Amino acid sequence: MRFRGLDLNLLVALDALMTERKLTAAARRVKLSQPAMSAAIARLRTYFGDELFSMQGRELIPTPRAEALAPAVRDALLHIQLSVIAWDPINPAQSDRRFRIILSDFMTLVFFERVVERLAREAPGVSFELLPLDDDPYELLRRGDVDFLVLPDLFMSSAHPKAKLFAEALVCVGCPTNEQLLGELSFEKYMSMGHVAAQFGRALKPSFEQWLLLEHGFKRRVELVVPGFTLIPPLLPHTNRIAIIPLRLVKYFEQTIPLRIVKHPLPPLWFTEAVQWPALHNKDPGNIWMREILLQEASRSEFQGETSLE
């Protein structure tokens, strides 16, 4: 189909090229052969009167003109998809929808595995692609490249709708044989002890308690840094190190990795896990159905109310 001389299929190719930045991957994304994608680039260059891309090794480097076109092309394709194509009511038992979700290792273990178990029964054709925290998840959200972010509410964008899942307490833990934890844990002792800390994404975003300390000008003695909370419990036994991790994670590992919970000298540490979705997907029946599943699972009694420290 052409619109004012432009083959609209070329916009799909341009969007894939801007997303993947590699010729072969972009061709695979839109189910074209590599020669066909090369031909599409040539036609795009002719139509727009611009090179659009140059090659640097195997990577496609967009020109300023291509960078300027990309957001409008993506928005146009999303509007077509959501307004024309994706409005059929979803039938969970027959759906083969695939959802792309950014969430932490912690949420995968303590929450999302329940969602997967439920949908294996109710919607066996539905599949998921779980993604790590990216350098810029908000750009993926804006472009509609992910269906949901599941993150602490504090770190969510104000430009897209969101909903609370549950509140979570952060607790200080260490090895049960760590004699330094027998007495009161003063602020001075807390700061001087070796810590195992989680940082997230390629940019190593700090966890909530680390962000809180940095905001007040304090710096812990961090001896180990890991890319997620779930790697911390196995690294504490038989050491004198401590860590701040979600309470539900302590309970998840309590049968295999016993940990001692100690009262930390910081203000009470809580955060709210929430789910966010692209504004463009707000009325998409499939997105509405999946977010209802997430909210229903979060409303179960074990996820509501204050989490007991006992």
UniProtKB/Swiss-Prot annotation:
PROSITE patterns: HTH_LYSR. The keyword Mitochondrion does not apply. One of its GO terms (molecular function) is DNA binding. It comes from the Bacteria. Residues 6-63 form the HTH lysR-type domain. InterPro entries: LysR-type_TF, LysR_subst-bd, NodD_PBP2, Tscrpt_reg_HTH_LysR, WH-like_DNA-bd_sf, WH_DNA-bd_sf. Residues 23-42 bind DNA. Gene3D superfamilies: Periplasmic binding protein-like II, Winged helix-like DNA-binding domain superfamily/Winged helix DNA-binding domain. Keywords: Activator, DNA-binding, Nodulation, Plasmid, Repressor, Transcription, Transcription regulation. CDD domains: PBP2_NodD. NodD regulates the expression of the nodABCFE genes which encode other nodulation proteins. NodD is also a negative regulator of its own expression. Binds flavonoids as inducers. Belongs to the LysR transcriptional regulatory family. PANTHER family: HTH-TYPE TRANSCRIPTIONAL REGULATOR LEUO (PTHR30118:SF6), HTH-TYPE TRANSCRIPTIONAL REGULATOR LEUO-RELATED (PTHR30118). There are at least three nodD genes in R.meliloti. They differ in their specificity of interaction with different flavonoids and, consequently, contribute to the nodulation of various plant host species to different extents. This is Nodulation protein D 2. It comes from Rhizobium meliloti (strain 1021).
